[in-house]
UniProtKB/Swiss-Prot annotation:
It is found in: Secreted. It comes from Oryza sativa subsp. japonica (Rice). Belongs to the glycosyl hydrolase 9 (cellulase E) family. Disulfide bonds: none annotated. InterPro entries: 6-hairpin_glycosidase_sf, 6hp_glycosidase-like_sf, Glyco_hydro_9, Glyco_hydro_9_His_AS. The active site is at D108, H450, D502, E511. GO terms for biological process: cell wall organization; cellulose catabolic process. Its EC number is 3.2.1.4. The keyword Nucleotidyltransferase does not apply. This is Endoglucanase 22. The gene is GLU11.
Length: 556
């Protein structure tokens, strides 16, 4: 489980001309030419050349595989993570509701609604904007399955227009046990928000997830898409009508996923996703009318996470202007303010804000750094927004001249992709430790991930029951590698100084979370498509492979 504090800062002062294929090639050519700013990894170009090329398609495939390891409920016959089994089959029984399904957020067995919904929102956003890239890599079906496993659960948990089940399990009792999910004996108490105990942040985030997913399924399953949109609209109405933070209503969540940023960002986020899903101007007006009072255009943010949605919603609002949305014209003034804040975040990632304190820190090895606990969640979400915004700029009507407007100098779309790529590469092993922070990728990766199911022998190999204390005695404390590889999991990652200790007890660094991996699905898909495009273009230009001398130059 991850905790975090929002970094809210005072506001600072202040027709397509190319084909898609050409844009892909031009962007990647620029990306390849730009330095990755990994100063501490400066053992030299020779060491870099000796490394094998990174396989973004494999990273994408394993990212989606990870979500199957996090499944709760009755697993399907198509389950590919075979060391897992059915779990949580009586969830909701005490309360008389069916809450079987959904995802475990990290290395334990609580189902927390807020980070689960954010995970699905990010998976859906990536599937909307980069559908062709995911499909080109052959992973579209798995992406849909990952999204649907979450949305099926959200529909179940929304048992009444003004009732939503926020959590199943209890973090305190869960942490006293080290068991496989198939054996768990901890509390499966369920907690809800309703009229008297509101949760606008949770309702808003879940509405955003369902609205985004409704777009994903619009063509392949119109009936299901309509169902998701119906629940999204009801949940938004619930969150807006009965306002309050869910952690004020549910004490048990405060130590794990407290909503530090409040609920205003989730309501704006949900409204913009509903506008994108429906095209109804009423949702856009909501985001415009509440832009100031809800902080949408008042806060300059250097974090995008399961808690703080401002940067994400600001990018969504900016997209309306970049796309030339007809409804945006009447609200251009406010939407320009949203765009300014979106660009403040992106410029902060690039280090292009004049005031250094307004920029995101970097480790010596080039990792974007926000805080010590599970920092890679912030690097992955930043990589996504950089990738998405560069895509919007490249696809806009003024793509030939479009650039990110930063106080320290404009940045082209290719430069944003370059930074996103540097974060992806850092995660995959291009870092000072030469260690992949994606489990199962590459030759070296964390072997002692803080994850109950992965750290205990599979029940399919040894079906004997393992109790709470026995799990700690026999499995948690042992120094050997986990018996099950949690493939595709992105762990919390290294310190500000690029230091990492592979220890099961070091949960700040070795625990993986669903929202670490979710944003990277689209990033890996995009990078795979771009590298494939440039390879194809090079082959088309020189189908015979060129002369030996030219091939030598190409390798350099």
């Amino acid at each position: 489980m991850s905790r975090g504090r929002a970094r809210l800062q005072p506001p600072p002062p202040g027709t397509r001309t190319t084909t898609l294929a050409a844009v892909l090639v031009l962007v990647l050519l620029a990306v390849v030419a730009l330095p990755l700013r990994c100063d501490a990894a400066s053992a030299g170009g020779e060491e870099e050349e000796e490394q094998q090329p990174l396989d973004y398609r494999e990273a994408l495939e394993k990212s989606l595989l990870y979500f199957e390891a996090q499944r709760s409920g009755r697993l399907p016959y198509s389950q590919r993570v075979t060391w897992r089994g059915h779990s949580g089959l009586t969830d909701g029984l005490q309360q008389g509701v069916d809450l079987v399904g959904g995802y475990y957020d990290a290395g334990d067995h609580v189902k927390f609604g807020l980070p689960m919904a954010f995970t699905v929102t990010m998976l859906s956003w990536g599937a909307i904007d980069f559908a062709a890239d995911i499909a080109a890599a052959g992973e579209w079906r798995h992406a849909l399955e990952a999204i649907k496993w979450g949305t099926d659960y959200f529909v179940k948990a929304h048992t009444h227009p003004f009732v939503y089940w926020a959590e199943v399990g209890d973090g305190d009792t869960d942490h006293y046990c080290w068991q496989r999910p198939e054996d768990m004996t901890t509390s499966r108490q369920a907690y809800r928000v309703d009229r008297d105990n509101p949760g606008s942040d949770l309702a808003g985030e879940t509405a955003a997830a369902l609205a985004a997913a409704s777009i994903v399924f619009r063509r392949s399953d119109p009936h299901y898409s309509h169902l998701l949109l119906h629940h999204a609209q009801q949940l938004f109405e619930f969150g807006d009508t009965y306002r309050g933070s869910y952690d004020s209503s549910i004490e048990e969540v405060r130590s794990y996923y407290a909503s530090v940023s409040g609920y205003h960002d989730e309501l704006l986020w949900a409204a913009l996703w509903l506008h994108r899903a429906t095209g109804k101007e009423e949702y856009l007006r909501y985001a415009v009318d509440n832009a100031d009072s809800f902080g949408g255009v008042g806060w300059a943010i250097t974090e995008f996470s399961w808690d703080v949605k401002y940067a994400g919603l600001q990018v969504l609002a900016a997209k309306l202007l970049l796309d030339g949305d007809p409804q945006a014209a009447a609200h251009r003034g406010v939407l320009e303010k949203y765009r300014e804040k979106a660009e403040h975040y992106l410029c902060a990632c690039l280090g292009r804000n004049i005031n250094g304190a307004d920029n995101v820190d970097r480790s010596p090895g080039g990792m974007l750094y926000v805080r010590q606990w599970n920092n890679l969640q912030y690097a992955s979400s930043a990589a996504f927004l950089l990738t998405a915004y560069s895509h919007y700029l490249s696809s806009s009507s003024a793509s030939a001249s479009a650039a990110l407007r930063c106080p320290g100098g404009a940045a082209a779309a290719a430069e944003m992709v370059s930074l996103a790529r540097s974060q992806a590469d850092y995660i995959l092993g291009r870092n000072p430790l030469r260690l992949s922070y994606m489990v199962g990728y590459g030759r070296r990766y964390p072997a002692r991930v803080h994850h109950r199911g992965a750290s205990i022998v599979s029940h399919k190999e040894d079906g004997r029951f393992i109790g709470c204390v026995q799990g700690f005695d026999d499995w948690f404390g042992r120094g050997r590698a986990n018996p099950n590889v949690l493939a595709g999991a992105i762990v919390g990652g290294p310190s500000r100084r690029d230091e990492f200790r592979d220890d099961r007890a070091n949960y700040m660094q070795t625990e993986a979370c669903t929202y670490n991996t979710a944003p990277m699905v689209a990033v890996f898909a995009r990078l795979h498509r771009l590298t494939t495009a440039i390879t194809t273009a090079a082959a088309a230009e020189d189908p015979d492979g060129g002369s030996p001398d030219r091939r030598s130059v190409d390798r350099r």
